[in-house]
């Protein structure tokens, strides 16, 4: 359960045939409108993000700072029939609102997460579409980019300690992969993409599931690197994870 935050404002809107709402951080944004969640509204200030995802994210240049716009898209076979609509179960249960509030809770616990700025949903009868706007982290690269670039400066131990911190706080990340771990040149790490994530009582099963998913991701993007090399790096990560977990940090 994520606690109520007095700095959140929920603003309903009706624009033509569109009805929905925008949840935003009133300390970071003064005004909001539906156009903020439409790439075309930004014009030349929106730049598609090619890495990871499903062609559903853009860097945007805003008056309130550089940001990332992400629209929620389905994956797998179901995307062939339904690309971006989800069943309506109430505004507070939309994926954008849940992720926005989860990210704010993680930040309140001191975890390295980009700041969520606003979340939007648009209802279409018994279905809805959603999008989220968040702070852009500058000077970072994804772990996937570092691996593909054969970087010698990947701080595997730091990544392991970071994941341990999130797990210690009970975060079950639904898609822990190399695209969702960001690194800077100093070795600082961040975790992104908390769609379908949840706070749980720390348990071995889901923690191991998260780590196994990350390993599969690293094997998938290994390129010309040997499988043994991937496992050696992952073992470094896991040793640091286990040590941090044992110390309770």
Swiss-Prot record:
GO cellular component, one term: plasma membrane
Membrane topology note: Peripheral membrane protein
Enzymatic reactions: an alpha-Kdo-(2->6)-lipid IVA + ATP = a 4-O-phospho-alpha-Kdo-(2->6)-lipid IVA + ADP + H(+)
E.C. code: 2.7.1.166
Active site per the UniProt annotation: 175
Keywords from the named record: ATP-binding, Cell inner membrane, Cell membrane, Kinase, Lipopolysaccharide biosynthesis, Membrane, Nucleotide-binding, Transferase
A GO term, aspect molecular function: kinase activity
Pathway connected to this protein: Bacterial outer membrane biogenesis; LPS core biosynthesis
Alphabetical list of Pfam families matching this protein: Kdo
Main location per the UniProt record: membrane
Localization annotation: Cell inner membrane
Any Gene Ontology biological process: lipopolysaccharide core region biosynthetic process
Leader sequence segment: none
Sequence similarity: Belongs to the protein kinase superfamily. KdkA/RfaP family.
Function: Catalyzes the ATP-dependent phosphorylation of the 3-deoxy-D-manno-octulosonic acid (Kdo) residue in Kdo-lipid IV(A) at the 4-OH position.
Protein name (database record): 3-deoxy-D-manno-octulosonic acid kinase
The organism's taxonomic lineage, starting at the top: Bacteria, Pseudomonadati, Pseudomonadota, Gammaproteobacteria, Lysobacterales
């Amino acid at each position: 359960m994520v606690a109520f935050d007095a700095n959140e404002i929920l603003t309903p809107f009706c624009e033509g045939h569109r009805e929905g709402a925008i949840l935003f951080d009133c300390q970071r944004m003064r005004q909001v409108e539906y156009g903020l969640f439409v790439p075309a509204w930004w014009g030349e200030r929106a730049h598609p993000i090619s890495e990871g995802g499903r062609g559903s994210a853009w860097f945007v240049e805003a008056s309130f700072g550089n940001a990332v716009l992400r629209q929620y898209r389905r994956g797998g076979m179901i995307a062939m029939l339904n690309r971006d609509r989800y069943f309506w179960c109430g505004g507070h249960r939309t994926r954008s609102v849940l992720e926005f509030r989860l990210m704010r809770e993680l930040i309140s616990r001191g975890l390295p997460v980009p700041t969520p700025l606003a979340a939007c949903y648009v209802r279409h009868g018994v279905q809805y579409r959603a999008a989220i706007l968040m702070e852009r982290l500058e000077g970072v690269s994804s772990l996937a980019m570092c691996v593909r670039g054969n970087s010698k400066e990947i701080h595997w131990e730091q990544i392991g300690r970071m994941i341990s911190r999130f797990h210690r706080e009970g975060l079950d990340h639904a898609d822990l992969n190399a695209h969702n771990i960001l690194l800077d040149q100093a070795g600082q790490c961040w975790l992104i993409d908390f769609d379908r994530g949840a706070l749980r009582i720390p348990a071995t099963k889901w923690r191991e599931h998260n780590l196994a998913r990350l390993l599969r991701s690293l094997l998938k993007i290994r390129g010309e690197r040997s499988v043994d090399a991937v496992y050696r790096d992952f073992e470094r990560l896991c040793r640091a994870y286990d040590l941090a977990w044992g110390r309770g940090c």
